């Protein structure tokens, strides 16, 4: 089973950094707007091999890491751990249209699309609040 989802870019119309938190991140106040520019994320669940945890990432942008450094990979790990799924095999294909390091949330939106895709393919075990909590835990 597989699903393809858009991962829209966003721009900050207003951003105020309020202070550093104990976890090293900053509290912010922002107003943002999605734009028409999107990455395209395809998530595919494959038949798992007992005892195997496999996340395979491919990307149209050669400079993007396709391993645990990628937020899409971290999102998949967070999803499977959050659902107590310990045997899994999935493929994630990232068609990059959002420029890297442009401040348009390309990595974050890709991770969010992976969470939404895995949740849909798994029969929606997590509600929106749980998905948001996983996303917040992944980082930026």
Language-model features: locations:
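Extracytoplasmic/periplasmic copper-protein system
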Residues: 132
């Amino acid at each position: 089973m597989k699903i393809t989802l858009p991962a829209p870019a966003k721009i900050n119309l207003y951003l105020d950094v309020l202070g550093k938190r104990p976890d090293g991140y900053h509290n912010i106040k922002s107003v943002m707007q999605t734009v028409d520019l999107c990455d395209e994320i395809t998530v595919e669940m494959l038949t798992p091999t007992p005892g195997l945890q496999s996340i395979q990432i491919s990307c149209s942008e050669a400079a993007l890491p396709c391993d645990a450094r990628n937020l899409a990979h971290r999102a998949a790990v967070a999803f499977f751990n959050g659902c107590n799924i310990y045997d899994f095999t999935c493929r994630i294909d990232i068609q990059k249209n959002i420029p890297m390091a442009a401040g348009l949330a390309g990595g974050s939106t890709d991770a969010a699309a992976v969470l939404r895709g895995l949740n849909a393919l798994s029969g929606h075990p997590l509600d929106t609040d749980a998905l948001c909590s996983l996303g917040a835990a992944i980082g930026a």
